[in-house]
């Protein structure tokens, strides 16, 4: 088990450093893929617990928020995040009759996923576009990656 985790960690480190060095839209698309996978895992985790967070809204909202974070115009990031939140609220209002027992928790899980994965994760994309961004992104991500081994 430890050998398998070490090999997967090495692959992730190599691919991650390649994305960081490439920079630009290659990095933005790579980090968007990572954020989408994180949102998918988050949604499945709640689904196993008997809750129903909105899988499509979490994936699309987190991905769009991260993609628009790569743009220097911060208004697009806020627009994408705001539309994601409004879409999540509308989705759960319409789905409330199907899941009345867990409706509030479903909405809370979706909104917290959008905030903690989508909005805060989008700052990884913004961090790379700072001067010396490759240094800052490696400095920010390396301790978390190393501690996960």
Residue positions per predicted region:
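Membrane-embedded alpha-helical bundles of polytopic integral membrane proteins
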Residues: 2-149
